[in-house]
């Protein structure tokens, strides 16, 4: 049976990340980057309180950062965010990451967020399968019992006093939000029931009953200009105003911190202007703070309690731990807690009177008192659960006191390696660095974990005031070290992740095994500080120094492109395709290896192998193979036997060892480097597909998508258009000009020279516009008046009705049938065209079954005749379907491309627009 890590260990691991320095950002001030006296005073706020608030949401960016910052920084409470999904079903406005890679990016963005609001981050196993209009659909895809169990587990681990959910009711879209809140409400009671999810109890978790559950009731207050405050009218409602008060230690309001935190959700377009005092205070629309309604409580008075604050009725003081002992607590418990509280008060007074170093003595006394009380608990005659609850919180206080003591002593600790990408068996030079900026000597020594061996001089020694010590150690990475990558992968039968069983539940990522433990003695008390071993890099011009954990990578990292190859079922010489394989040498010296493709039966790769030679570490080589299908008759027979989708794999062989693993790097200036493991595979899709020959497409890249590669697979030549080409290039040489995802938001040159595209269409060209959001509505970029809406169709299996069956999009050169609308992924499309001039013609209509999105939906595929040419808007999500290998999407795109160079027919009769 798998055992969970003790709750106290998870708490220590969560706090350990605070010792990893963060990079600077323009005009932003991460609270985690605070040092010296401000950091000390912030830490002192945590020592005499045990307040604990958990927030639950559906996706990254749903959280109220002001509330987390207020309770975490201003009040000193423990704050945690449990996010149901990692947001992998959303869009990406800064790069090409989708699906699993987007999950990694958005998880890292939350880590960047918490450098401001200070919360711990946890997740359930739920997958963001895309926008949903149905709680029932969400529960069915997630698995109600599985995700409910995840919430129960996190409540039992974190043991919050107050839980804050997101929206509970509402008939709008995004029903993941309502689902997560309803599951949280059920978990609020279930976590206290030992009969609920008994397997968790068997692994060592204890039941826990939180005291209050709130949910978001809207924005703006009763007179606010934002969304009206909502609720059932039968429970108490208050507006959270804690974010509006100025915190002199932070130098900002918590609302201002929240604005900085929220700007880290950059892939969701939230890198907006920061709030200014009196201009845009609070989370959400201007006009007021967020409202919360009490949904459930175990406190007297029930949900009608006239509370003005979330923690009204909850004793959050450290001294209040005596309540676990019942009506007559042991005198030793009361006295022990009193000594700890007094030591904290003495430390605050010392800092105020004489500065940081003056707090060392009181803090050492406080740490000693915590440890003494821990040791005495067993002899106090406490009930088992009382002892458990008190001891758990005292263990957390030990960690907090140790870290605060280091701050008071003005000791800085670092652990850095000379290589950030390592392979099994590699020696690494690690430096454990300590600087004593205080006015008293400290004793310290260091050790490394996660390595096979570590040699060097880091024995315990005295570090004098104003001195520094650099312990240089040689460590060996284990030969069979696990490759560094996300510990979650998609389940095949549900919208859930499967987690590696050795990773503690809920963690954002697997914790690095490479850790330095620094043992200090400060003021006569021992402190043990965990410092993850990091590598340093210069980043780019804007990010400066960046740090990341050490990544274990394959000796030879292998990748293959393109990821998808489209082969016409007719076969023949034109069906041969090029496959490129890139090999990166991560060994520390020269190396030679052979590269080959593993092909399905009857397929041939030419040449059979390529030899690659490397002279140094991090050198790369790319080789090309020609992939040829079997003869046409054999290819047709293979397809009939179900072989329309095949896999070609790249392998590297050296000395009898085979390497067949690569990775995708996910990193931006505001995030830490992460790897997503990728098998070097090419999916070969054999399709009954034709496309007009010799097509050249001018592509205006937007936020980053994989559509150009898909166009190349269809046989078109895709050229990325530069600003100069948009401004004065010869556009007439393109049969089609296509704008990428969100191009009108990303490309100022496209907005500036949009008239050139309309003139191109008027002269007989075909313009295809992939989906945009509301930035498209800032001017008339289409040939006639029309706007983008938030309308979407989320059911990937929704009913399809072709409105103009004779249109070449559905007939030429490929006949689009019902089969082409099957096996779509996640959705039909989003941000459909709306409020359109009658000159626009809808070509297709979707209908999905969900009550909150019923009725036919137009605007997914819209065409307008412009002069002798065409202008098309694609709300239909081909940009998502093409990288996913959806067959029908390729056939439909082939027809859209084949419109190029053909005159637009007279506009058909307008479609009734009642479905909009």
Region roles according to the model:
Residues 417-686, 691-693:
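Long beta-sheet-rich domains in secretory-pathway and surface-associated proteins
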Residues 391-395, 542, 546-587, 593-595, ...:
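Extracellular ligand-binding/catalytic regions of CAZymes and related secreted enzymes
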Residues 400-412, 547-557:
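Proline/serine/threonine-rich low-complexity linkers at boundaries of modular beta-sandwich domains
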Residues 7-18:
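Bacterial N-terminal signal peptides
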Residues 658-740, 771-773, 880, 898-915:
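Aromatic-Pro/Gly-enriched surface loop or interdomain linker
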Residues 192-405:
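The feature marks non-catalytic terminal segments
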Residues 742-823:
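A glycine-rich, often tryptophan-bearing local segment used as a flexible ligand/cofactor-contacting loop or short
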Residues 25-198, 219-220:
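Active-site beta-strand->loop->alpha-helix modules in alpha/beta enzyme cores, enriched
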């Amino acid at each position: 049976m798998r055992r969970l890590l003790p709750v106290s260990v998870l708490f220590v691991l969560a706090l350990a990340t605070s010792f990893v320095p963060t990079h600077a950002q323009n005009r932003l001030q991460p609270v985690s980057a605070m040092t010296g006296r401000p950091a000390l005073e912030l830490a002192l706020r945590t020592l005499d309180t045990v307040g604990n608030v958990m927030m639950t949401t559906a996706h990254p960016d749903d959280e109220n950062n002001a509330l987390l910052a207020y309770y975490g920084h201003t009040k000193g409470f423990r704050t945690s965010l449990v996010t149901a999904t990692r947001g992998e079903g959303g869009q990406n406005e800064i790069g090409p990451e989708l699906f699993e890679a987007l999950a990694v990016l958005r998880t890292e963005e939350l880590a960047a967020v918490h450098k401001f609001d200070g919360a711990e981050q946890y997740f359930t196993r739920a997958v963001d399968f895309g926008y949903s209009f149905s709680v029932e659909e969400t529960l069915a895809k997630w698995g109600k019992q599985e995700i409910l169990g995840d919430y129960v587990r996190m409540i039992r681990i974190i043991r919050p006093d107050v839980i804050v959910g997101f929206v509970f009711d509402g008939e709008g879209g995004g029903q993941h939000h309502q689902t997560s809140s309803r599951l949280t409400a059920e978990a609020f009671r279930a976590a206290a029931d030992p009969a609920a999810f008994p397997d968790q109890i068997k692994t060592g978790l204890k039941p826990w009953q939180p005291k209050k559950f709130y949910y978001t009731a809207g924005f703006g207050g009763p007179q606010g200009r934002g969304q009206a405050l909502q609720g059932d009218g039968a429970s108490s409602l208050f507006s959270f105003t804690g974010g509006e008060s100025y915190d002199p230690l932070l130098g900002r309001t918590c609302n201002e911190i929240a604005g900085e935190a929220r700007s880290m959700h950059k892939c969701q377009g939230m890198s907006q202007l920061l709030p200014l005092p009196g201009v845009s205070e609070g989370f959400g629309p201007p006009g007021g703070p967020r409202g919360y309604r009490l949904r459930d409580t175990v406190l007297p008075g029930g949900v009608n309690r006239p509370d003005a604050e979330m923690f009204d009725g909850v004793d959050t003081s450290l001294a209040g731990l005596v309540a676990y002992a019942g009506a007559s607590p042991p005198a030793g418990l009361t006295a022990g807690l009193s000594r700890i509280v007094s030591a904290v008060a003495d430390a605050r007074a010392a800092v105020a009177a004489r500065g940081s170093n003056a707090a060392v003595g009181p803090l050492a006394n406080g740490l000693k008192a915590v440890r003494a009380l821990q040791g005495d608990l067993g002899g106090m005659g406490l009930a088992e659960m009382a002892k458990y609850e008190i001891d758990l919180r005292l263990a957390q206080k030990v960690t907090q006191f140790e870290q605060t003591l280091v701050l008071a002593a003005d000791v800085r600790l670092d652990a850095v390696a000379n290589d950030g990408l390592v392979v099994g068996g590699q020696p690494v030079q690690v430096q454990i660095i300590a600087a004593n900026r205080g006015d008293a000597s400290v004793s310290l020594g260091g050790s490394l974990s996660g390595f096979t061996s570590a040699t060097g001089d880091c024995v315990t020694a005295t570090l004098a005031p104003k001195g520094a010590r650099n312990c240089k150690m040689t460590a060996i990475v284990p030969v069979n070290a696990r490759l560094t990558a996300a510990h979650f992968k998609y389940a095949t039968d549900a919208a859930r992740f499967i987690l590696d069983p050795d990773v503690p539940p809920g963690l954002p990522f697997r914790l690095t095994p490479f850790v330095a433990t620094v043992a200090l003695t400060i003021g006569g008390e021992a402190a043990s500080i965990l410092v993850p071993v990091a590598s340093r890099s210069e980043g780019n011009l804007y990010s400066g120094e960046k740090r990341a954990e050490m990544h274990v990578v394959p000796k030879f990292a292998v990748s293959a492109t393109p990821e998808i190859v489209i082969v016409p079922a007719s076969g023949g010489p034109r069906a041969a395709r090029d496959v490129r394989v890139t090999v990166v040498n991560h060994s520390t010296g020269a190396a030679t290896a052979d590269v080959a493709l593993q092909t399905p039966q009857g397929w041939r790769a030419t040449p059979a192998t390529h030899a690659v030679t490397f002279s140094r570490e991090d050198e790369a080589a790319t080789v090309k193979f020609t992939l040829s299908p079997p003869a046409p008759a054999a290819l047709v027979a293979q397809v009939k036997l179900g072989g329309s989708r095949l896999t070609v794999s790249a392998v590297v062989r050296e000395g009898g060892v085979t390497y067949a693993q690569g990775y995708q790097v996910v990193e931006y200036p505001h995030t830490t480097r992460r790897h997503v493991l990728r098998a070097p595979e090419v999916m070969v899709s054999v399709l009954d597909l034709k496309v007009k020959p010799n097509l050249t497409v001018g592509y205006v890249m937007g936020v980053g998508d994989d559509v150009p590669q898909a166009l190349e697979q269809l046989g078109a030549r895709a050229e990325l258009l530069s600003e100069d080409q948009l401004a004065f290039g010869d556009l007439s040489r393109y049969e089609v000009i296509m704008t990428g995802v969100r191009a009108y938001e990303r490309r100022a040159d496209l907005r500036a020279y949009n008239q050139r595209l309309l003139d191109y269409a008027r002269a007989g060209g075909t313009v295809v516009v992939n989906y945009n959001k509301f930035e498209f509505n800032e001017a008339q970029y289409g040939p006639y008046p029309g706007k983008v809406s938030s309308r979407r169709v989320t059911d990937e299996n929704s009913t399809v009705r072709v409105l103009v069956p004779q249109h070449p999009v559905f007939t030429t050169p490929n006949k689009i049938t019902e089969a082409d609308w099957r096996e779509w992924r996640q959705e039909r499309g989003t941000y459909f065209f709306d409020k359109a001039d009658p000159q626009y013609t809808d070509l297709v209509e979707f209908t999905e079954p969900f009550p909150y999105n019923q009725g036919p939906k137009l605007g997914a595929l819209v065409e307008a005749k412009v002069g002798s040419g065409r202008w098309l808007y694609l709300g239909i999500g081909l940009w998502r379907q093409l990288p996913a290998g959806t067959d029908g999407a390729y056939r439909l795109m082939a027809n859209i491309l084949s419109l190029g160079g053909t005159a637009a027919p007279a506009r058909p009769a307008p479609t009734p627009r009642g479905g909009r």
